[in-house]
C-alpha cells in the first residue's frame, strides 16, 4: 500500500469559527486544550487533564486563562472523559473539530490528515510500531467519533516533522529488501520541535538542536527549520536513555534473553517499554524528581541512573553538533527539559567541556497549539 498523504500545509483560511478540542492521551490521563478559532485567529481558552485510575471516578481539571481571571474548574467525571469534555467545550461555543496527537502513522501515513475509516484502519495496522501509545489513542478516536457525530476528527503525527529527513539520517543499516518494506528512521516529538520553531520565528536559527526531555526523550538537529537528524529511530524506544525505555541497546542482549528463555516476546516488550531506562537502573518509578531526591540522599543506584541519563543526553547533543557542523542554539523543552534545572545544568556542564558554551534557551513544548493549527488548516482546506 502506498503512503497515505495529507494536503500540503498552508495558512488557515479565515472562515471556520468555533471550538477546536486538542487531545493528547496517556496511559492513565488525558491532556487536552480548548482553542477558539475566530476569523482564522486561534486563541487558547484553556487546558487541562482528565486523570483516572481503577479506584474511583475520573477527575477533570481545567485551567481557564484566555481573557479572563485565571481560574481552575475541577469536577468528578461520572461518565466518560470525552463526554465531560464535550460538555465543557460546548459551553464555550460551537465545536468545529477535534485534533488528536498520534505518535506513529506506521509505514503509510506521513502527514497530518483527517481521520477517515481507511486512515483509522491504517493506524490500527501501525500499532506494532507504538504499542504503548497508539492503542489508547485509537480507543479515544473511537469514542470521539461516537461523541462528536459529524464533527471532523484530525490526526496530527509526531513523525511528520521528520518525514523529509535526508537519506543519510533516514536510512537504516539493513539490506535493501528490508528497507523496501518501508522501515526507516521516522523520528518523534515532531510537534514539539515544530512548536519550538514557531516560538523562534522572529529570531530564526540556522543550526538548532532541540532536546525534548520528558518520560520519553529525544534530541533533534535542525538546519534552517528542517529536521536533518534525530535520536529516535523506527520507534520511540531508540536513542537516549529514557524514564522507562532503554534507548539504543545492543540487539544481542535481546537475542540472549529470548534464546535462554528468560523472557518471551511479550514479556520482553513489557521490559523495554515499562521496566528499563532510569527506572530499571535505579529501581524507582523513573520520575526525575524522585530520582534526583534519591540521588541527593546518597542512593547509589539513583545516582548511577541520573549520571547515565545526563551522559546519554549530552552524547546525543554532541552528536547532533557534528551533524550540523556546529551549533547556534540549544533549546531544552519537555517536562524534564523545562523544569529539572539541576539535570539541565549538568547536561550543559558536560557538553561545555568539549563544545564550548553554546547559546541556550528553555522553551515550553506547545504541541497542542500546533495540533490546533493543523486541525484548522485541514478542515478549511
Language-model segments: which ranges?
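Glycine-rich phosphate-binding/hydrolytic loop that grips phosphoryl groups
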Residues: 357-381
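Adenine-nucleotide phosphate-binding core of ATP-dependent small-molecule kinases
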Residues: 270, 277-281, 288-323
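Short glycine-rich, Thr/Ser-proximal phosphate-binding strand/loop in the N-terminal lobe
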Residues: 25-76, 233
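Oxyanion-binding "anion nests"
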Residues: 250-253, 257-284
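Glycine-rich phosphate-binding loop of actin/hexokinase-like ATP-binding domains
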Residues: 161-258
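Short beta-strand-loop/turn "lid" adjacent to the catalytic site in phosphate-handling enzymes
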Residues: 85-134, 151-154, 160-171
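Glycine-rich phosphate-binding loops at beta-strand->alpha-helix junctions
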Residues: 328-350
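Conserved phosphate-binding catalytic cores of ATP/NTP-utilizing and phosphoryl-transfer enzymes
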Residues: 11-17, 135-148, 189-208
Amino acid at each position: 500500500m502506498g503512503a497515505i498523504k495529507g494536503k500540503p500545509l498552508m495558512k488557515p483560511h479565515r472562515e471556520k469559527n468555533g471550538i477546536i478540542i486538542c487531545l493528547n492521551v496517556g496511559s492513565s490521563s488525558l491532556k487536552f486544550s480548548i482553542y477558539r478559532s475566530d476569523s482564522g485567529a486561534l486563541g487558547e481558552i484553556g487546558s487541562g487533564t482528565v486523570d483516572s485510575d481503577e479506584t474511583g471516578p475520573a477527575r477533570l481539571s481545567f485551567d481557564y486563562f484566555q481573557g479572563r481571571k485565571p481560574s481552575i474548574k475541577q469536577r468528578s467525571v461520572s461518565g466518560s472523559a470525552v463526554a465531560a469534555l464535550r460538555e465543557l467545550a460546548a459551553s464555550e461555543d460551537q465545536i468545529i473539530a477535534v485534533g488528536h496527537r498520534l505518535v506513529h502513522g506506521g509505514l503509510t501515513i506521513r502527514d497530518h490528515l483527517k481521520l477517515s475509516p481507511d486512515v483509522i484502519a491504517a493506524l490500527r495496522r501501525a500499532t506494532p510500531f507504538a504499542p504503548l501509545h497508539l492503542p489508547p489513542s485509537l480507543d479515544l478516536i473511537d469514542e470521539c467519533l461516537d461523541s462528536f457525530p459529524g464533527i471532523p476528527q484530525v490526526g496530527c503525527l509526531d513523525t511528520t516533522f521528520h518525514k523529509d529527513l535526508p537519506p543519510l539520517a533516514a536510512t537504516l543499516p539493513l539490506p535493501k529488501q528490508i528497507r523496501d518494506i518501508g522501515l526507516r528512521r521516522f523520528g518523534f516529538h515532531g510537534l514539539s520541535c515544530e512548536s519550538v520553531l514557531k516560538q523562534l520565528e522572529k529570531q530564526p536559527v540556522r543550526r538548532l538542536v532541540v532536546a525534548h526531555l520528558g518520560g520519553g526523550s529525544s534530541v533533534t538537529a535542525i538546519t534552517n527549520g528542517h529536521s536533518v537528524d534525530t535520536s529516535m529511530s523506527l520507534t520511540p524506544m531508540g536513542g537516549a536513555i529514557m524514564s522507562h525505555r532503554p534507548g539504543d541497546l545492543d540487539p544481542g542482549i535481546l537475542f540472549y534473553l529470548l534464546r535462554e528463555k528468560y523472557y518471551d516476546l511479550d514479556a520482553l516488550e513489557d521490559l523495554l517499554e515499562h521496566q528499563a531506562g532510569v527506572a530499571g537502573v535505579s529501581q524507582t518509578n523513573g520520575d526525575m524528581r524522585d530520582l534526583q531526591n534519591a540521588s541527593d540522599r546518597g542512593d547509589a543506584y539513583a545516582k548511577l541512573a541520573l549520571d547515565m541519563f545526563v551522559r546519554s543526553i549530552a552524547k546525543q547533543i554532541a552528536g547532533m553538533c557534528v551533524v550540523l557542523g556546529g551549533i547556534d542554539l540549544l533549546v531544552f523543552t519537555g517536562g524534564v527539559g523545562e523544569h529539572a534545572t539541576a539535570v539541565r545544568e549538568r547536561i550543559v556542564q558536560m557538553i561545555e567541556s568539549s563544545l564550548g558554551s553554546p547559546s541556550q534557551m528553555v522553551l515550553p513544548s506547545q504541541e497542542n497549539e500546533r495540533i490546533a493549527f493543523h486541525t484548522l488548516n485541514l478542515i478549511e482546506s
